[in-house]
C-alpha cells in the first residue's frame, strides 16, 4: 500500500455497503429506512459511509448521542438525524437549531424542550419512545403512559415526528415476545389515534425484524448491523437478505525472528515453543480494539494461510506463529478480520472466542486505526482520526 498510514488499518468497501443497503431496500419496499450509524457506524466510520447509505436506500440516520449527530451535521449531512438515547437539556438549543430529532420519554423534559423551541421561534422535533418490553427507556404502554404522551403532543413548541419501540428478541427463532411487543405498540398508537393524534412515522423493526417479520415494518424500519454485512444472529432467515461484510482489518508484519524450543512468548509466559519456531510480531494490540481475550485463540491470514495468535495480546502488539509459512518478512500484509481466497476469520469468529456478539467486535475497533475507503477496488478516501 503506497499511502502513508499507520501499518494497522480497516478497509471499508463502499460498494459492499451500497449493495447491502440495496438488498434492504428491496426487502422492505417503500418503507422509510432509518440507517443506524451510532458508534461511528459500528466501527465503519459514520462520516464516510453516511452518504453511501443515503444514496442507496436510506432516507434518515440514527445515532445514540448528540456529538454523533453534530459530527454528521458539521460534515454537511442534511438528512433527518434521530438521537436514539438521552440528551441533557442543556443541548436543547443545539438540537432545535440543527433540526436533530430527539427521543423523548419524560414529560418534564418535553416541556423544557418546548420552552426552548418557543424562545427560538422554532419547533423541537421529537420521537416518542414506548417501552413495550425492553425495560430500557420509554413510556409504558398503559393509561398513565397514554396520558403523558397526549400531554406531550399538546405542547406548542414540539413537533412529534415519530413513535417507536425497540424489540429485544426479534433475532431469536421464537418470535412470541416480539409479537407481544408489536401488539403493545400498535394498540398504544390506536389509542393515540382515538384521541385525535396521528404520528407520521411509526417504527419498530430492527435488523432481526427487518429480516424475519415484514408485518412489523409500520411506516419505517431501523437497520443497524445488517447495513454492514453481518446478520444479527444465527437464528434469522439469512436467505431473506444476501449480505456481505464491508470491513476488513489489516496490518503488516513488524518483525520476524526464530526462537529455539522451550522459549516463552509475551506476558505471563503463557506460551512456550515446543520446537524451533518462527514468530512474527504484528503492530496491533488491545488499544486498537484487538482484544486480549483473543490471546492464544485467534487466527490471522498471512500469504493465504492461517497463523495462530500465540501468547497474550499486548496493548500495541501481538505475536503469531508462522513456522509453517514460507518467506514471511517485515511488511507482509496480514488479515486479522476478514476473508481472502476462501479463508475466513471474521467478527462472528472473534465473537465466538470472546463470548460476545459481532456488533461489539466491530465497535471495538479504536480511533487509533485509520479507515481506508474503497470503490471499484480503488482507494477513494483515508480517514486518520489521530
UniProtKB/Swiss-Prot annotation:
Cofactor(s) required for function per UniProt: pyridoxal 5'-phosphate
Reaction(s) catalysed (UniProt annotation): L-alanine = D-alanine
Biological or metabolic pathway of the protein: Amino-acid biosynthesis; D-alanine biosynthesis; D-alanine from L-alanine: step 1/1
Sites bearing N6-(pyridoxal phosphate)lysine, chain numbering: 38
UniProt binding sites for substrate: 136, 315
Entry EC no(s): 5.1.1.1
Gene Ontology CC: one annotated term: cytosol
Catalytic center residues: 38 (proton acceptor), 267 (proton acceptor)
Gene Ontology molecular function: any one: pyridoxal phosphate binding
The organism's place on the tree of life at top rank: Bacteria
Broadest EC class assigned to this enzyme: isomerase
SS bond list: none
Keywords in alphabetical order: Isomerase, Pyridoxal phosphate
GO biological-process terms attached to the record: D-alanine biosynthetic process; peptidoglycan biosynthetic process
NCBIfam families: alr (TIGR00492)
Family: Belongs to the alanine racemase family.
Function (record text): Catalyzes the interconversion of L-alanine and D-alanine. May also act on other amino acids.
Protein name (database record): Alanine racemase
Protein source organism: Clostridium perfringens (strain SM101 / Type A)
Phylogenetic lineage: Bacteria, Bacillati, Bacillota, Clostridia, Eubacteriales
Gene: alr
Amino acid at each position: 500500500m503506497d499511502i502513508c498510514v499507520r501499518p494497522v488499518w480497516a478497509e471499508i468497501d463502499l460498494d459492499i455497503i451500497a449493495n447491502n443497503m440495496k438488498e434492504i431496500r428491496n426487502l422492505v419496499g417503500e418503507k422509510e429506512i432509518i440507517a443506524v450509524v451510532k458508534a461511528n457506524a459500528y466501527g465503519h466510520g459514520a462520516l464516510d459511509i453516511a452518504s453511501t447509505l443515503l444514496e442507496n436506500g436510506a432516507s434518515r440516520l440514527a445515532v445514540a448521542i448528540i456529538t454523533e449527530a453534530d459530527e454528521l451535521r458539521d460534515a454537511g449531512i442534511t438528512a433527518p438525524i434521530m438521537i436514539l438515547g438521552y440528551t441533557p437539556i442543556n443541548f436543547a438549543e443545539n438540537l432545535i437549531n440543527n433540526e436533530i430529532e430527539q427521543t423523548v420519554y419524560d414529560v418534564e423534559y418535553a416541556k423544557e424542550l418546548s420552552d426552548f423551541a418557543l424562545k427560538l421561534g422554532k419547533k423541537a422535533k421529537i420521537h416518542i419512545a414506548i417501552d413495550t418490553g425492553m425495560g430500557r427507556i420509554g413510556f409504558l404502554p398503559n393509561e398513565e403512559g397514554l396520558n403523558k404522551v397526549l400531554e406531550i403532543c399538546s405542547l406548542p413548541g414540539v413537533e412529534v415526528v415519530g413513535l417507536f419501540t425497540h424489540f429485544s428478541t426479534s433475532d431469536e427463532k421464537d418470535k412470541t415476545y416480539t409479537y407481544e411487543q408489536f401488539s403493545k405498540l400498535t394498540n398504544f398508537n390506536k389509542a393515540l389515534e382515538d384521541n385525535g393524534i396521528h404520528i407520521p412515522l411509526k417504527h419498530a423493526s430492527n435488523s432481526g425484524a427487518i429480516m424475519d417479520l415484514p408485518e412489523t415494518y409500520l411506516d419505517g424500519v431501523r437497520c443497524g448491523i445488517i447495513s454492514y454485512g453481518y446478520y444479527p444472529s444465527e437464528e434469522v432467515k439469512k436467505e431473506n437478505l444476501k449480505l456481505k461484510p464491508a470491513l476488513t482489518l489489516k496490518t503488516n508484519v513488524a518483525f520476524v525472528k526464530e526462537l529455539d524450543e522451550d522459549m516463552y512468548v509475551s506476558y505471563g509466559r503463557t506460551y512456550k515453543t515446543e520446537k524451533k519456531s518462527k514468530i512474527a510480531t504484528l503492530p496491533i494490540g488491545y488499544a486498537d480494539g484487538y482484544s486480549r481475550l483473543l490471546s492464544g485463540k485467534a487466527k490471522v491470514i498471512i500469504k493465504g494461510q492461517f497463523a495462530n495468535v500465540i501468547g497474550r495480546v499486548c496493548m500495541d502488539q501481538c505475536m503469531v506463529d508462522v513456522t509453517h509459512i514460507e518467506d514471511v518478512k517485515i511488511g507482509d500484509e496480514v488479515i486479522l478480520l476478514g476473508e481472502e481466497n476462501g479463508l475466513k476469520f471474521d467478527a462472528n469468529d472473534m465473537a465466538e472466542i470472546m463470548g460476545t456478539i459481532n456488533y461489539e467486535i466491530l465497535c471495538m475497533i479504536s480511533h487509533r486505526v485509520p479507515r481506508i475507503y474503497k470503490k471499484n477496488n480503488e482507494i477513494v478516501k483515508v480517514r486518520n482520526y489521530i
